[in-house]
Amino acid sequence: MVSTNAGGIASKQASSMAPNPGKATILALGHAFPQQLVMQDYVVDGFMRNTNCDDPELKEKLTRLCKTTTVKTRYVVMSEEILKSYPELAQEGQPTMKQRLDISNKAVTQMATEASLACVRSWGGALSEITHLVYVSSSEARFPGGDLHLARALGLSPDVRRVMLAFTGCSGGVAGLRVAKGLAESCPGARVLLATSETTIVGFRPPSPDRPYDLVGVALFGDGAGAAVVGADPTPVERPLFELHSALQRFLPDTDKTIDGRLTEEGIKFQLGRELPHIIEANVEAFCQKLMQEHPQAADKLTYGDMFWAVHPGGPAILTKMEGRLGLDGGKLRASRSALRDFGNASSNTIVYVLENMVEETRQRREEAAEEEDCEWGLILAFGPGITFEGILARNLQARARARD
C-alpha cells in the first residue's frame, strides 16, 4: 500500500484565520492506496483481456467512456495475481460473493489502517488520544464490522466510541465529516478519527451487453482510503485546516433508483441513471442556499464566487452541470477535477483527496506569494444513493485574510 498525508501547512507564517471556540475543525488529513496503479490509456485492452471478452461493440463503448471520464490514473486492489487465484471472478454467472468479500474485507481494513496512521502522524498526536472512531465503507459486509477491525489494527483503546456508516456510497465521506463534527462539538476534548475505505472488487465482472452500467464503473471508479482527525478547540501545537459550521443531509423523494446497487451471489450489481447530473443540477442551488442560511452571517455576505468549493467529483458531467447552474468559473472546481483525474471516483474517499488538493493549493499560493486571494468560506458537498445530498459550510483556516476597508 502507498500512503501519504496532509496536515498543517509548513510555513513560518501562522494561520491567518483563528478558529472559533467550540467549533469542530479538521486537524489533519491522510490517504492510502493499493499498489496497483492503473493508467487510463491501458484500461480497455487490459480489462478486455482479463475478462476474455472480444466483443467489438463493448470495446468501442468502453474506449469512449474512458476518454469522457477525464480520469488519467487510478489505484485498484484487483490484480493479475488475484485473477489467477480466483479466475471465477472474471467468469459470467459464477457465485463469487464469498471470495469477493474475503478479498475486500482484508483490503479495506489494510488501506484504512495506513491512511489513518498517515493522518495521525500529520496531526502530531497519539493514537491513545483518539476518543471516537467514525468508519465509512460501502465495500464490505461482515460483523463485527470494519470499525472494530480498524480499531484493533490501530491499537485504539477498547473504550473508543465507534460509529460505522455503511453503503452510503459517494456521499459517505461528507456524511462521516458531519457525524465527526457532531461528536467533536458535543464531547469536549474529543479527538475523532474519521476513516473511509473502498474497493471496486465487489463489483468486478466481465462485460455484457445486458449491463452497460458495468462499463461506467470500469472507466470511472478507483480504490483507496482516506482519513481525517476532527476536534474542537485546537491546542497550540495543532494546526487546524478547516472549521466545520452548518451541516445538512437531504434525500430527494422518488430518486432512490437513480443510483442503485444490489448485493447478489455474483457480486454487487450497480446501475447509474443517466438523469443523475440533471437531478443534481436541478436541486443543488436550493440545497446550497439552505446550508448557507443555517449561518446567517455567512449567507448575508457571501456570493458563490466568493467561496471555495470542495465537491465530490462523481463524474465530469456532474461538475460541469454544477458550474453552469451556480455560475462558477472554471477554477472553482479545480481541486475536484484534479482528484478525479488522478484517482478516479473513489466513492467516499474522494472528498478527502479534494480537501488535500485545496490544502496544497493554499500552500503553493503562499510560497509563491500569489496575488490570488484565498476564499475563507466555502461548501463541502457530495451526492450519493437516495439520491442523498450531504453538505457542510466550512471556513478555510489556512486562508489569508482579505484586506478590509
Curated annotation (Swiss-Prot):
Its main location: endoplasmic reticulum. GO terms for molecular function: acyltransferase activity, transferring groups other than amino-acyl groups; tetraketide alpha-pyrone synthase activity. Expressed in adult flowers. Keywords: Acyltransferase, Endoplasmic reticulum, Transferase. CDD domains: CHS_like. Belongs to the thiolase-like superfamily. Chalcone/stilbene synthases family. Residues 1-20 are annotated as: Disordered. Residues 1-18 have a biased composition (Polar residues). The keyword Endoplasmic reticulum applies. Disruption phenotype: Defective pollen exine and Ubisch bodies patterning, shrunken and aborted pollen grains, and male sterility. Male sterility and defective pollen walls. Altered composition of lipidic and phenolic compounds in anthers. No significant reduction in sporopollenin accumulation. This is Type III polyketide synthase 10. The active site is at residue 170. Its EC number is 2.3.1.-. Plant type III polyketide synthases (PKSs) that catalyzes the condensation of fatty acyl-CoA with malonyl-CoA to generate triketide and tetraketide alpha-pyrones, the main components of pollen exine and potential sporopollenin precursors. May be involved in the synthesis of sporopollenin precursors in tapetal cells to regulate pollen wall formation. Required for exine and Ubisch body formation in anthers. Does not possess chalcone synthase (CHS) activity in vitro with the substrates 4-coumaroyl-CoA and malonyl-CoA.
